[in-house]
Amino acid sequence: MPKIVFFNHYHRGDLLTHKEFIRQVQTELPNYTYEYMHFNHPKLTRDLNIPLIGEPTNLDPKTPFYQEDGVLYINTWIGCFWDIFCQHGGINMNSLWHQWEKIFVQINDHFEVDLNLKEQKEFYLPSIDFNKFDVSKIDSYLKENTNKKVLICNGPPKSGQSFADNMQDFINPLAEEYPDVHFICTTKFPTEQKNVLFTDNVIGDTEVADKRAPWEDKEVNICDLQEISYLSENCNAVVGKNSGPFVFCETKTNYMNPNMKFLSYNVSWGEAFHTGEKKPTETMSNSLEYKCEYTIVPISDINTLTADDIANINQSLDTLVRSL
């Protein structure tokens, strides 16, 4: 039986953004064997129904394809297609689409088939099969709390997409001003506000895996990104830094929900950076047609927020909450 092994050496969001491309391959080539190799929690690719066979330790992270004994190994990391990454301004659906255009050519040549990408890039916005995960505690929280909810992905980005600060100095005053709104944060910080909640408490994930990724400084034992995604689809707004949990909230359901509001703090990158413009291009929303309200606030200095950055963050958060 023909066989394809997908592999990826990098972060969790890198595994999410390729799901619909992989699902198309699975659908159009149903009589193939599929396997996956990555360093992350096995939950991250569970809903693809592809066996996780280990880690790609012996494979080069910058090599896009391997062929061995008739098996095609496909690297799903966008960074191994550096020309595409740079041409389209970093990670966004344009760069992913053109990456998979090359992957489809390789699959077609290797197996003598005729896969074609769909022209509508919105088709490839990721979806998660939440039936594969325990979301019962989230459902209980949602049933007991019908007030407005803002999910804030306030942890540090893994790849320099935005500032690392946990935003407590922005969130605590905001929560005090709007006591009827729940602000659910993905990273804990000291607070006396009863309406500041944390995903650790709302989700209560207990599924532990003994994993250590080479780029982590601690064991990756718990992964609640799918559950955070589920929670996001039941919130009124999502705030984040274009990394980690925020990426898992950028689902097709949320993008096509006209009542959903996104607020993203991004650095400038790619062509916009080099021409002196401040419009960030490294965002999944770039050039897509979506129904949600998506606001990007550029961050000028991710190491030390400037006075303008601080003012823009405060103003954008207040504007967002007032609009709910």
Feature annotation, model-predicted:
Residues 33-35, 72-82, 88-93, 100, ...:
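Active-site anion-handling motifs in enzyme catalytic cores
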Residues 2-98, 227-231, 244-255:
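Active-site and donor-binding regions of nucleotide-sugar-utilizing enzymes
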Residues 6-8, 37, 153, 184-186, ...:
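Short hydrophobic segments within beta-strands
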Residues 84-165:
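Mid-sequence helix-capping/hinge segment at a functional interface
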Residues 47-63, 68-92, 191-222, 277-304:
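Active-site regions of enzymes building and remodeling cell-envelope glycoconjugates
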